Amino acid sequence: MSQDNATAPTSNFLRQIIDADLAQGTYADRKDATGQPIPPVVTRFPPEPNGYLHIGHAKSIWVNFGMARDYNGRCHLRFDDTNPVKEDTEYVDSIIDAVHWLGYSWSDAGGEHLYYASDYFEQLYGFAEVLIQRGVAYVDSQSAEQIAANRGDFTRPGTLSPFRDRSVDENLALFRDMRAGKYKDGEHVLRAKIDMAAPNIVMRDPVLYRIRHAHHHRTGDAWCIYPMYDFTHCISDALENITHSLCTLEFENNRPLYDWVLDHLRDAGVLAAPLPHQYEFARLHLTYAITSKRKLLQLVTEKRVDGWDDPRMPTLVGIRRRGYTPESIQLFCERVGVSKADSWIDMSILEGAVRDDLDARAPRSVAVLDPVKLVLDNVPADFNEPCSAPVHPKQPELGRREFPLTRELWIEREDFTETPPKGYFRLFPGNKVRLRYGYVIECTGCDKDAAGNITAVHANIIPDTKSGTPGADSVKVKGNIHWVSAAHALEAEVRLYDRLFSDPQPDSGDKNFLDALNPNSKKIVKAFLEPTLATAKAEDRFQFERHGYFVADRIDSQPGKPVFNRVVGLKDSWGK
């Protein structure tokens, strides 16, 4: 989002940390290798390109890019592409597109700040040799299963590897042979030599490098050993002059290893202070949604949804296709805020953000989603009277839209009943209602087919009651229904999306998340729309009066033949 559209930032513990660093000049007066000044606040967003970003990533993007923006710093986009088996350029492209869609940029006066961890493979390898030479890293020849079994748990310490005391020369020779491709996958790993009795299991001689004979999306087959995330991440931060490495709470236990690697490399003289520091904030737990990549992939592969960009998915491509705006995502993040404690955020907050955003900007229109014909019997067959309504009731400068009132109309099936319940003010025989922006009418009856289904409703116009005329209030009515001209309406496909899950925490505990799928999360209807919608372009958003907010589908919608997705209803239908 542009800074012009950003609201005043709310104070939180991350801002307090940054404010203190600025006051102390922790990262002041730095210059890069070319002599260019480095801002005192440099953050980064480092996704692994092994899937599509989801709403949880949006919060991390907002935090990292937003902090950099608010402090006139910069934020880097860095791909943590150290696992060639799971990564693909498809995901790289989708992540770049998603961050751009959210309105953020990684460019500044110093150029583009788009990076890949694979850019640093040679340097990372060199740093690994430095740790070996300092006697704090060793090649372990145990199997992955043995390493896991010997790591211990929270009740017992780990067991030292029988290969832990190899000499520096032997470790260097083995590590270089690993790089040269002389060993099979899993035959050796490089581990840090820290403390196998550490209370924090992360610090029990973590693996730094593993052998993986796999094609990398950028480096091809140049490498057959790849660094682990914990080794790569902190060094990449240091090489890019990151100041504040902001990540979610699941990495809290990894922070000591982050510091351990950087401290050893600083002491070896290959990295210089001031070094970056990692800080953790609460990740986003959204009700009625899942964000596990494995489970999202299962939904896609089992065809429980229509792909990664299914509008019911929590992926950013799905949320975008649903009709959410970048501004609504930012508003949602602002309302959720930044804290140190994990908590569940109700889906209604996300829906409320897009509802508030679109209420302020979306043009109004009319759509009949479950149509039944209404015949006005006391006007001629060629009756055609122009009606108009504001494009937006709070923005008169946008003008008015015009549409015809004719003898035959489409109305919502639920707006007529033969036997009205108490409090029903819409059409039933003998009752009067107003046709929105048109006349007051009185219902006279209905037609049915042989099965008893209502095929048409009949009514008479009450003259001199048209909206906007002196006689508009001459007949008092309680009901007001919307309509479109049967002769002029635009027929279109409308997809009524709802929450994908009916359980607020579908994968908590030992639940099978598939059991919580909402069978009513998608309904496709043939609707009749106000004819002005024929010119709707992909991603144009509207309020369909009395129904909610809708968007022209960015993939399937065509000029003159739009397809609309429901973004959100006018009110929260899930509230207790």
Curated annotation (Swiss-Prot):
Catalytic activity: tRNA(Gln) + L-glutamine + ATP = L-glutaminyl-tRNA(Gln) + AMP + diphosphate
This enzyme's EC code(s): 6.1.1.18
Subcellular location: Cytoplasm
Binding site for ATP: E48, P49, N50, H54, I55, G56, H57, A58, K59, S60, T248, R283, L284
Motif ('KMSKS' region): 290-294
Family assignment from sequence similarity: Belongs to the class-I aminoacyl-tRNA synthetase family.
PROSITE patterns in the cross-refs: AA_TRNA_LIGASE_I
Subunit structure: Monomer.
Tagged with keyword Cytoplasm: yes
UniProt keyword list: Aminoacyl-tRNA synthetase, ATP-binding, Cytoplasm, Ligase, Nucleotide-binding, Protein biosynthesis
Keyword Aminoacyl-tRNA synthetase among UniProt keywords: yes
Protein name, entry field: Glutamine--tRNA ligase
Binding residues annotated for L-glutamine, in chain numbering: D80, Y229
Biological process terms in GO annotation: glutaminyl-tRNA aminoacylation; glutamyl-tRNA aminoacylation
SUPFAM superfamilies referenced in this protein's UniProt entry, alphabetically: Nucleotidylyl transferase, Ribosomal protein L25-like
Lineage: Bacteria, Pseudomonadati, Pseudomonadota, Betaproteobacteria, Burkholderiales
InterPro entries attached to this UniProt entry: aa-tRNA-synth_I_CS, Gln-tRNA-synth, Gln/Glu-tRNA_Ligase, Gln_tRNA_ligase_bac, Glu/Gln-tRNA-synth, Glu/Gln-tRNA-synth_Ib_cat-dom, Glu/Gln-tRNA-synth_Ib_codon-bd, Rbsml_bL25/Gln-tRNA_synth_N
Example of a GO cellular component annotation carried by this entry: cytosol
Molecular function GO terms recorded: ATP binding; glutamine-tRNA ligase activity
Motif 'HIGH' region: where in chain: 47-57
